[in-house]
A protein has these predicted regions:
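Conserved core of the sugar-phosphate nucleotidyltransferase
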Residues: 1-63
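Conserved alpha/beta core of the MobA/IspD/sugar-nucleotide pyrophosphorylase nucleotidyltransferase superfamily
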Residues: 38-116
Length: 116
């Protein structure tokens, strides 16, 4: 399983990932310090069948059993890193995170004229 990430700078407001000595992801959180982070997550995930099942059970347990309905998906991801392997997938090239219409307009201006 993979988490797409960007190594081009620490962003305080973004989810960061930390890796172990083997390069596998061990933690994802906004609170990871700059001297401990490996990269910034861009919130794109590729899960193998094993990880998808484990994550599904973790989310079910969080919502249905623990009754915690206001947590990010990353909280569940962080809880399963000890149960399955995730590696960082470093993106390259230009990209821009779009969370709302204002971000979309800004991205359109930044990438205006780019050929795909």
């Amino acid at each position: 399983s993979l988490i797409a990430c960007d190594r081009n700078g620490y962003l305080e407001e973004s989810m960061k990932i930390a890796t172990d000595e083997n390069g596998k992801i061990k933690h994802i959180s906004k609170q990871i310090a700059e001297d401990e982070y490996y990269a910034v997550s861009i919130d794109v995930y590729k899960l193998n069948a094993d990880a998808a099942g484990i994550l599904s059970r973790e989310i079910y347990d969080t919502i249905e059993v623990k009754k915690s309905e206001n947590l990010w998906t990353e909280v569940a991801l962080d809880a399963i890193f000890s149960k399955t392997v995730f590696a960082p997938y470093e993106i390259c090239g230009r990209w821009f995170e779009i969370d709302n219409h204002d971000d979309l307009r800004r991205a359109e201006q930044i990438f205006k004229g780019d050929v795909i």
